[in-house]
Amino acid sequence: MFKNLLCIIIFLGINLNVYAINSSSYTTDDIIKIVIILGIVILIFSPAKFRIIVIGTMLGLSCAYFTYKYIVPIFISLLNGP
């Protein structure tokens, strides 16, 4: 498991260097894709008890993200008024 995760971390480091050479940076969409891929890899190589914790954490973080991205701006716009 750790060998596979180490390969993925090295791959992400190479990608980060390529982004730095091209003088661009990760966007939010890139980071979300990386987190999803890492979550899937961790789920594949993790034991059953740990898998339940990871699934719960991923669900909680995704709910928090969508709340922050979609619901909070609605309340902010309501506070600002028409």
Swiss-Prot record:
Protein name per its UniProtKB record: Uncharacterized protein RC0131
GO CC terms in record: plasma membrane
Membrane topology: Multi-pass membrane protein
UniProt keyword list: Cell membrane, Membrane, Transmembrane, Transmembrane helix
Protein's organism: Rickettsia conorii (strain ATCC VR-613 / Malish 7)
Subcellular location: Cell membrane
InterPro entries listed in its UniProt record: DUF5510
Pfam short name (any one): DUF5510
Taxonomic superkingdom: Bacteria
Residue spans crossing the bilayer: 5-22, 26-45, 52-74
